[in-house]
C-alpha cells in the first residue's frame, strides 16, 4: 500500500499504533513520501478526525484492515484511530473504500519471512459481508481492485469539480 500512497499526491495518512508496529516489522516505516501528511495514533480522542467535520475530506481509504478492525467497524465500536476515523467518515457522509485482509476462505499473505497460508474464520468472512452492506462504503477484495477503485474515485472527483 505504501507505493500506492506515494503515487497519490496530496493525501493525509492516519497510522494506528498497530499499523506502525507492522510497518516496522516489514521494514517499511521510513518509505512514505515526505509529501504525505502523516497523523499518528497518539491521543485517546484522535483530535485529527476533526477534519472530517470541517469538510476537508471527500474519501477515506482504509487499507489494509485487520479482522479485528473490520469487526469493530461493523458493530460500531470506535475505540481506536482506525475505527474512530471510519465512524466519523460515516457520520459526515465521506465516501469510504475499505480493503479488509480476510476476504476469502483461503488466502496467501505476505509475512515478514515470506508468503504464508491463512484461513480466515467464518465470523471474519461474515463481517466482511456485513461491511459490504454499509452505505457509501465500497469493500474491495484485492489490492488490484483497491487501486482501480481509488483511480475511479479520483476520476469521478475530477469530473465533479469541473
Language-model segment annotations:
Residues 1-162:
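A cross-family phosphate/adenosyl-ligand binding-site feature
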Amino acid at each position: 500500500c505504501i507505493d500506492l500512497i506515494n503515487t497519490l499526491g496530496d493525501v493525509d495518512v492516519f497510522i494506528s499504533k498497530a499499523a506502525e508496529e507492522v510497518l516496522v516489522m516489514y521494514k517499511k516505516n521510513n518509505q512514505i513520501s515526505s509529501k504525505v501528511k502523516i497523523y499518528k495514533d497518539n491521543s485517546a480522542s484522535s483530535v485529527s478526525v476533526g477534519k472530517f467535520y470541517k469538510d476537508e475530506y471527500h474519501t477515506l481509504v482504509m487499507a489494509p484492515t485487520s479482522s479485528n478492525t473490520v469487526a469493530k467497524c461493523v458493530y460500531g465500536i470506535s475505540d481506536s484511530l482506525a475505527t474512530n476515523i471510519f465512524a466519523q467518515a460515516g457520520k459526515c457522509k465521506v465516501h469510504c473504500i475499505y480493503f479488509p485482509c480476510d476476504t476469502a476462505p483461503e488466502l496467501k499473505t505476505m509475512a515478514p519471512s515470506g508468503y504464508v497460508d491463512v484461513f480466515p474464520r467464518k465470523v471474519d468472512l461474515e463481517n466482511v459481508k456485513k461491511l459490504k452492506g454499509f452505505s457509501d462504503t465500497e469493500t474491495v477484495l484485492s489490492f488490484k481492485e483497491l487501486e482501480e477503485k481509488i483511480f475511479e474515485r479520483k476520476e469521478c472527483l475530477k469530473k465533479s469539480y469541473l
